[in-house]
From Swiss-Prot:
PROSITE patterns: SAM_CHO2. Present with 1810 molecules/cell in log phase SD medium. This is Phosphatidylethanolamine N-methyltransferase. Induction: Repressed by myo-inositol and choline. It comes from Saccharomyces cerevisiae (strain ATCC 204508 / S288c).
Amino acid sequence: MSSCKTTLSEMVGSVTKDRGTINVEARTRSSNVTFKPPVTHDMVRSLFDPTLKKSLLEKCIALAIISNFFICYWVFQRFGLQFTKYFFLVQYLFWRIAYNLGIGLVLHYQSHYETLTNCAKTHAIFSKIPQNKDANSNFSTNSNSFSEKFWNFIRKFCQYEIRSKMPKEYDLFAYPEEINVWLIFRQFVDLILMQDFVTYIIYVYLSIPYSWVQIFNWRSLLGVILILFNIWVKLDAHRVVKDYAWYWGDFFFLEESELIFDGVFNISPHPMYSIGYLGYYGLSLICNDYKVLLVSVFGHYSQFLFLKYVENPHIERTYGDGTDSDSQMNSRIDDLISKENYDYSRPLINMGLSFNNFNKLRFTDYFTIGTVAALMLGTIMNARFINLNYLFITVFVTKLVSWLFISTILYKQSQSKWFTRLFLENGYTQVYSYEQWQFIYNYYLVLTYTLMIIHTGLQIWSNFSNINNSQLIFGLILVALQTWCDKETRLAISDFGWFYGDFFLSNYISTRKLTSQGIYRYLNHPEAVLGVVGVWGTVLMTNFAVTNIILAVLWTLTNFILVKFIETPHVNKIYGKTKRVSGVGKTLLGLKPLRQVSDIVNRIENIIIKSLVDESKNSNGGAELLPKNYQDNKEWNILIQEAMDSVATRLSPYCELKIENEQVETNFVLPTPVTLNWKMPIELYNGDDWIGLYKVIDTRADREKTRVGSGGHWSATSKDSYMNHGLRHKESVTEIKATEKYVQGKVTFDTSLLYFENGIYEFRYHSGNSHKVLLISTPFEISLPVLNTTTPELFEKDLTEFLTKVNVLKDGKFRPLGNKFFGMDSLKQLIKNSIGVELSSEYMRRVNGDAHVISHRAWDIKQTLDSLA
């Protein structure tokens, strides 16, 4: 993921046009003629500021706007309220269509073919034409044909309009046709936009309830807030983009100016068309009339159609799609996964009411869609018999349990690559594990949201008489907003980001950089902010049902916890703790009061950190008072042990149980045998004496009697004893001899008697055929070897040599019958101890214990996990 190149491609005029003076350079689109655009004014000043010159069209537009109010009064007095409302509703629909369809078509043809500009050039509308026919033009002022008279009139009218509008120093013929055409185009835009606005406002005014009780409530307060916010958006948008982008200037000519994101354009994509219409919904709240709300939704939706089919294509064609190589990193990762893994196919994704990437040969896709179909059909067929309380509990428990399951996978995957390891150790690939995760995550989303839809639908159906139509529509708008957020999020981060690919395939990431394109330009975590608004929309749709409020709180909390405590720490670990300020954050911090609060918090934080550092320095000074050899415990322990041995020798000079070379080696690496020297007074020795090997943690502090079994890890002290226990205990006795005062011998514990577990052990000498302890050796350590993992060949070589010495390898295959102490678990531990990965017992049985396959598989897993680090 990466930051996006700053261009105009995000929106019309989504940048500051530094036009403080007339020194801004501009050029025509096709002929590349450069010029300096004249100073222009906004729509309101042009029409209503008495200090500015007014053209004939501007005066007509102002009169038309004012006349709407007189017409409203007359129609109201003559035909009544309802007729007047519908009269202005029809007018609004006309002007809205003229805006989105009429202006849209004009701009479409101007963008593709420069129709208006070419028309002006063809008919010499803005050129100096002599009274006789110009040899280089098809235009003639002396012709009596209707067409030529018409264009002659248009020529004179347009030139008169511009001269009456612009200052005296404006030279009409010194500028290219593009700028003059744009100035005339602005007049018609003023007419359509102002009429669109005024007729809508009059319609809304006529729909406001007459009762003060219906007006003064929380809806009106929220509506006023939205209206004020809308006004700020429009004013700030014009401050940023100026007239050039406000009137679609780049459809006619291009300005050469620095592009800077600022103000409201940091908050939302296409703010003039998105949050710039919140006033519509504020007025709808004040009216509390669902008809007004539907009209507002129609107006807003048609504006988005204008954006999609007119502005965005022009922007992409003129400025590019606004993406660079870094911004497409996630998309390239998806392509790379498909390229390197031929059996990989894009995952099924649920977006709103549709499914993307359905694969007819993938069973899980049928299972997911079948689950939705079964739940929906079951609900429709049994709607009358479904208990809403039981359904609520089902939705709540399903959401909570499935979220815990998903969160656990992500947390353990982030900490130790647990999910990937689980599949690798069972013989599957890294990408296969990712595919299974994709199914799990998508199924989790589909299941929980399907249950939420069913619960909300039944809640509305059972209580429909109390449902407010406006609340129902507002709820659907919030659902649509969440659906849009999900689509924009996926568009920005692709499938790889949508499915938390950096948790599972971080080795595919080539650039450690978070994306700042699309919706992530405005919000750092859009899924945490807008990803639950649809769930809160169900609260509105159900008239604030308690069960839906509880579910909305659950959705919000689980979403917040997942982002805050699992996703954010992992992102910091993968991409670094770079502080990324969202567009909304930049705008808020740009406000002076909030900036002052932020500065105060930063100063307090610095004071606290400084005091903690000073206190830490003072506390560290006390450590210098300790002796220098305080931490050197090793020599002290050796001295204590020698003293204890000295005391034991004086008490019984012929009692001895020592490990050979114990002064040199206290850690025995398998398969190295451990040889034990023992000595007992002849009067205490019994032919049935035996020596057992135990974990120190098992025997604990009981020094007189062993209360745990040896598990077969024992040896006789004499070859003539324990004849019915096989040869193993005889072969371990390598030496025994007796004198007049004592008996001494030597016992060797090899791989047939030793433990194959890392740990601290001790030998215990037992009297006769009992568990009474006579002697205990010094504790020592046994550890598994660390095999050479430089190459898979060296790893295989060391592994086969070790298994051969342990007597569990036959024909290149692992056969645990050769040593009962070295089983499948021991082999797994050996591999894990050497290479850091674990293979499952099921996988090793599946490959028949083949040492070659096992060693190479373990080495491949190691390489995969290393690439994820």
